């Protein structure tokens, strides 16, 4: 069972601040080892995770499974868009949704990434993830992204 955490309405200066926040939050939740926050920052620097979709940009930061204690996903919707470097070039994209992945094994990570990429190609799902009230976000993400077989 994957832990799912959601948070909206936080302002960040830049992606470094976002990644630091994610690292601190996941440490506080007890789902990562103390090596995870720095590993997340290092991996994002080497392998950027910003993705421009049809209507919105997102980022899916993650790092090696060795740094995880248990599986989790952290959905973070910053107050203002935050620039992340795109995964496929040197340009930045203004991200309105961050989906941080904490996984315990590489096969699980690959499966989860494939699932996410498939669902995030649907503009209506992305729009809903960005605009839905925070109180409904966990249920929606679980039902329409994680548990959906479509």
From Swiss-Prot:
InterPro entries linked: PTrfase/Anion_transptr, PTS_EIIA_type-2_dom, PTS_SugarTrans_NitroReg
Residues of the PTS EIIA type-2 domain: 1-144
Principal subcellular localisation of the protein: cytoplasm
Residue list for modification Phosphohistidine: 62
Protein name: PTS system galactitol-specific EIIA component
Any GO BP: galactitol transmembrane transport
Entry GO terms, CC: cytosol; transmembrane transporter complex
Gene3D superfamilies reported for this sequence: Mannitol-specific EII, Chain A
Entry-linked SUPFAM superfamilies: Phoshotransferase/anion transport protein (SSF55804)
Domain of life: Bacteria
NCBIfam families: PRK09665.1
Domain remark in the UniProt entry: The EIIA domain is phosphorylated by phospho-HPr on a histidyl residue. Then, it transfers the phosphoryl group to the EIIB domain.
Keywords of this entry: Cytoplasm, Galactitol metabolism, Kinase, Phosphoprotein, Phosphotransferase system, Sugar transport, Transferase, Transport
Induction conditions: Constitutively expressed.
GO MF annotations, alphabetized: kinase activity; protein kinase activator activity; protein-phosphocysteine-galactitol-phosphotransferase system transporter activity
């Amino acid at each position: 069972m994957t832990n799912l955490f959601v948070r909206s309405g936080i302002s960040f200066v830049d992606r470094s601040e976002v990644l630091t926040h994610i690292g601190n939050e996941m440490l506080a939740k007890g789902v990562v080892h103390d090596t995870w926050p720095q590993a997340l920052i290092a991996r994002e620097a080497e392998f950027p995770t910003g993705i421009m979709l049809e209507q919105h940009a997102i980022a899916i930061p993650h790092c090696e499974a060795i740094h995880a204690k248990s599986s989790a996903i952290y959905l973070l919707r910053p107050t203002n868009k935050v620039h992340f470097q795109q995964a496929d070039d040197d340009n930045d994209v203004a991200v309105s949704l961050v989906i941080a992945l904490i996984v315990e094994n590489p096969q699980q990570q690959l499966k989860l990434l494939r699932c996410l990429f498939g669902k995030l190609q649907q503009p209506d799902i992305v729009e809903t993830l960005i605009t839905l009230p925070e109180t409904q976000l966990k249920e929606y993400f679980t039902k329409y992204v994680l548990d959906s077989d479509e």
